[in-house]
Structures are given as structure tokens and as C-alpha cells.
A protein has these predicted regions:
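Extracytoplasmic
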Residues: 1-31
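Short alpha-helical segment of the dimerization/phosphotransfer core of two-component systems
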Residues: 107-115
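Conserved micro-motifs of the catalytic ATP-binding
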Residues: 127-132, 172-175
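Short conserved segments within the C-terminal catalytic ATPase subdomain
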Residues: 153-164
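Short helix-loop "hinge" at the ATP-lid/N-box region of the Bergerat-fold HATPase_c
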Residues: 191-192
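Short conserved segment of the HATPase_c
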Residues: 223-235
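Conserved glycine-rich
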Residues: 263-265
Length: 290
């Protein structure tokens, strides 16, 4: 209400306005604001769910692999324990069989010790605490030493073991000579174990522009292509001739981890009925080592 002059007096003027449209606009703005808030909250929840899922996925995968690893390890440990228990029971019943049963128990204990060592190595690798030395390694000496170590075993199994290296010295690499020897030991042990008598295993090497390529080839039954894709998986063993009580399916996994620690690559280069070839490539430092 407003007062306005009118002659000698005053008059009141009242202005009326319909605010229904304004109220409608206010409610529309409130609704739009509430919708935007709800949409923002929904988007925030979706983003949190997405990022949380991505963050949790590696943890879930790690837990799944750990559960599978423990289950497989338990299964592998159960086998030698069963043999030891059976041998111990038989020893109580028939003492005359003591020498044979004692050897059986000793062999199974040795198997368990190897398995535990392998499990500890992989556990250190998973924890990121597995380290290797960083020193110059004479590849020629490493190959010769490894071949000489396996030559008696090859002869015992009726196999030929060949060492093929170039006439000139191979370049030296940096790493842990003991661990590199362990990789070659795994490859040669597999090759000698799965190659039938009369076959041949070859340990070879060649120099590449920036690397040294080591090769282990055998004339065994080969690895089916379906199995080759999983050959480095832990506890994986093909259901073919490449299966042995002496092997737990961990050797190649350990060799792969050691290769990674040396910044190299390990792969199955060739498989088939004519045999299998594993190739280990190690980088050569740009500056020559002495």
C-alpha cells in the first residue's frame, strides 16, 4: 500500500499482483536444482563405484591367485606325505623291507624340500623381496659350467648333450651368475627329463646386436600349442609325456620370474612333435664389461 497526495489530502493506492507464475517458476527452479543434485550424487556414486572396482580388482585377482596357489601347493605336499605315511606303516609291518622303504622316504623328503624351496622363492617374488646380484657375468663360462654339470645325467639317460657356441667370445651381461645358472638348470632339467633315450638336447647361444640369446632345444615329444600358452603358469603340467613326478610345475614359473628380474625374456620358441625350443634373451650393457 502506498500513500499519494490528492488535492489537500492523501489517498492510498494499493497495487495487487498475481504471483502464481513466480511461485511456479520458483518450484520449477527448486525441482531442477533437486534433479541436478540427485544426478550429481548418482554420477558421484557411479564414479566411486567404478574407481573402487578398478582398485579392488587387482586385490581380488591377487587373492584368487593366492587361494589357487595354496590349494595347488597343498595338493602337491599331500602326495609325498601320503607316500611317507604308507612307507612308515609298511616299515612297522615288514622290517625286512627297511632299506627299500627308507630310500622311498628319503626320496619323498627330498621332493618336499625342493617343493618348499620353490614355494619360498615364488613367495619372495610375489612380495617383491626377491633380489638378484648385479655383477658382470661371463656367459661362455656359465654355459660351459652348466653343460658339464648335466653331461653325466645325459649319459645316464642315454641322451646326447651338445654345447653350441660361436667361435668368438660372447659379450658379457650384468646379473646374478647363480640365478642365471638356475634358469638354465630348469630348462636343461626339463629337456633331459622329457626326451626319450636316444634323443638329443642342445644348449646353444648367439650374440645379437644388443642382447645374448641362449637356447635349449630337445628332440622330445614337444608341447601341444594349447599347453604352450600356459607353460609358465604355476603348477601347470600338460597331461602328456611332459609330466613327471619329479616336477611340480613350478620350475618354469621360477625361471620366468628370474628372467624378469634380469630384464630379459623367456619364451617357447618352437613346439611340436619334433621337439621343443626355449629361448632366453638377456640384454647386453652398452658399455663393454670386463
Amino acid at each position: 500500500m502506498t500513500l499519494i497526495p490528492a488535492g489537500r489530502g492523501w489517498q492510498s493506492l494499493v497495487l495487487l499482483k498475481d504471483i502464481a507464475d513466480s511461485r511456479r517458476e520458483i518450484w520449477l527452479l527448486r525441482g531442477a536444482f533437486a534433479g541436478l543434485v540427485a544426478l550429481g550424487v548418482a554420477a558421484l556414486v557411479a564414479l566411486c563405484w567404478l574407481f573402487a572396482g578398478r582398485a579392488i580388482r587387482p586385490i581380488e585377482e591377487s587373492q584368487r591367485r593366492q587361494a589357487e596357489f595354496i590349494a595347488a601347493a597343498s595338493h602337491e605336499l599331500r602326495s609325498p606325505l601320503a607316500v611317507i605315511r604308507t612307507a612308515a606303516s609298511a616299515l612297522a609291518v615288514d622290517p625286512a623291507q627297511a632299506p627299500r622303504l627308507r630310500r622311498s622316504i628319503e626320496n619323498e623328503c627330498a621332493r618336499m624340500a625342493r617343493l618348499v624351496d620353490d614355494l619360498l622363492s615364488l613367495a619372495r617374488s610375489d612380495a617383491g623381496t626377491w633380489s638378484v646380484a648385479d655383477a658382470p657375468v661371463d656367459v661362455d663360462a656359465l654355459l660351459l659350467e652348466t653343460a658339464e654339470k648335466f653331461l653325466p645325467l645325459a649319459r645316464e639317460r642315454g641322451l646326447s648333450l651338445h654345447l653350441e657356441v660361436p667361435d668368438t667370445d660372447l659379450p658379457m651381461v650384468r646379473g646374478d651368475a647363480q640365478r642365471l645358472g638356475q634358469i638354465l638348470t630348469v630348462l636343461l632339467d626339463n629337456a633331459l627329463s622329457y626326451t626319450p633315450a636316444g634323443g638329443a638336447v642342445t644348449l646353444g647361444a648367439q650374440a645379437l646386436p644388443e642382447a645374448v640369446l641362449l637356447r635349449v632345444a630337445d628332440t622330445g615329444p614337444g608341447i601341444p600349442s594349447a599347453d604352450a600358452a600356459h607353460i609358465f603358469d604355476r603348477f601347470y603340467r600338460a597331461d602328456t609325456a611332459r609330466n613327471s613326478k619329479e616336477h611340480f610345475g613350478l620350475g618354469l614359473s621360477i625361471a620366468q620370474e628370474l628372467t624378469r628380474l634380469h630384464h630379459g625374456t623367456l619364451r617357447v620358441a618352437s613346439t611340436g612333435p619334433e621337439g621343443t625350443v626355449f629361448e632366453l634373451k638377456l640384454p647386453v650393457p652398452k658399455e663393454p664389461l670386463s
